[in-house]
Amino acid sequence: MHRRDFLKLTAALGAATSLPLWSRAALAADFSPLPIPPLLQPDANGKINLNIQTGSVVWLPSTATQTWGYNGNLLGPAIRLQRGKAVTIDITNALPEATTVHWHGLEIPGEVDGGPQALIQPGAKRQVTFAVEQPAATCWFHPHTHSKTGHQVAMGLGGLVLIDDSDSETLPLPKQWGVDDIPVILQDKLLDKHGQVDYQLDVMTAAVGWFGDRMLTNGVPYPQQITPRGWVRLRLLNGCNARSLNLALSDGRPMYVIASDGGLLAEPVVVRELPILMGERFEVLVDTRDGQSLDLVTLPVTQMGMTLAPFDQPLPVLRIQPSLAIGSQVLPESLVVIPELADVTGVQERWFQLMMDPKLDMLGMQALVARYGMKAMAGMNMNHGDMGAMDHGNRPDMSQGKMKGMDHGTMNGAPAFNFSHANRINGKAFSMTEPAFDAKQGKYEKWTISGEGDMMLHPFHVHGTQFRILTENGKPPAEHRRGWKDIVRVEGARSEILVRFNYLAPASTPYMAHCHLLEHEDTGMMLGFTVSA
């Protein structure tokens, strides 16, 4: 964050905290409380019921927005699982369309992973049973319906999975759910003039992703969480379809990162800014012992489409209000043992070239600028990709961000461009029936994922594993990204990861590897692969 932005935020915050107590109470009353997802744990028989259903939420005055949720109107419960124990989940689909439930971050066999082949038809049920054999972590579950994932997530489907183990239970970490152990699911939303979720998969969103003009935290705009005075644990999930975030605290105090996607780090890592990609999770500790209220804010990012108001300046997403109660006073010096990286000499290597059809690149950028103006380009010029030397600076019809008479799907009367397979890996769009390769169970592989020649942001996710990042976008990984991960950043350069698959995945239910910008995934930037013994 630029110093001037911090000063602005700090001044605003200071004005609020200098108010007399009675008006501070009135100010607090203006905040909605942060909704805390209910904990859902296996019953005495090791079972959990999950109902995928329609619902409604009031985000705008006098308007009910139609939404989808798991066991409720929106989002879902936090499913709490224990390492070493099996669970059986009975899933019922009460939606009007088919869906799947993918267990993002869980190391489980392909047949229960919930990829696009594992469709649950409307009115149908599916039962999955698996044992949890991985370290404590914050994971999540969400749809993975081919070509429909972006829409189904935008409608509200998503929930947390909390894995506990002996390390997480014995370490002196905040553990009171909804008190000092706080889930923070961040998602942007776009509503139409009728107050309904305005989701379109078109040439623009296929190129840059679907993005909103408001931010929700656990489904509520800018809520407040009252916490004890002490160390507070935030379990952060970027649940956005396409928007990367960069989180900070409004008064500039540090956050201590204690866990990434796949579990606890070796020791807390101090950061003042925390970039978090779509689908990623981080756990951070925040020191509230001084009793001062503060905001979790998302800072501006340089990503196409994501620079528009209100995201063009620091945007508060959660007010943290310490009470008089005394909370955890301990910051652990060390957490868990992270194994040394395995020797990659002689291991199987694979190459993944992420690419967008140049025509989609061109049409998508044109549609973005036509709809939102040059500000949406995040500082990139218009010859990004294949747009040649178009000089938009002096075009009279571009001055107001309009391109007169342009149909976003057609150019010069040509047939509409079919973008449904325009995003690819190694030149191929996703196939539901042809896995791209077979990996061997328990064997390390080194994967290189390249975004060279494509300046788009691609958070690359691999099913069925927690991997280690060797290099990220051409550089050594940041310290807090050196633990267990299931998403790596690819943006115009190469990333290298060390993967290993402990379970089998047959051709009927292969694992997926894909871009977690959901509209890229839905338009082909995904492949299936098998794991055999």
Curated annotation (Swiss-Prot):
CDD domains reported for this sequence: CuRO_1_CueO_FtsP, CuRO_2_CueO_FtsP, CuRO_3_CueO_FtsP
Free-text remark on how the cofactor is bound: Binds 4 Cu cations per monomer.
Keyword ATP-binding carried by entry: no
Localisation per UniProt entry: Periplasm
The reaction(s) this protein catalyses: 4 Cu(+) + O2 + 4 H(+) = 4 Cu(2+) + 2 H2O
Annotated residues for binding of Cu cation 4: 458, 515, 520
Function per UniProt: Multicopper oxidase involved in copper homeostasis and copper tolerance under aerobic conditions. Is responsible for the oxidation of Cu(+) to the less harmful Cu(2+) in the periplasm, thereby preventing Cu(+) from entering the cytoplasm.
Protein name: Multicopper oxidase CueO
Organism listed in the record: Yersinia pestis
Gene that this polypeptide is encoded by: cueO
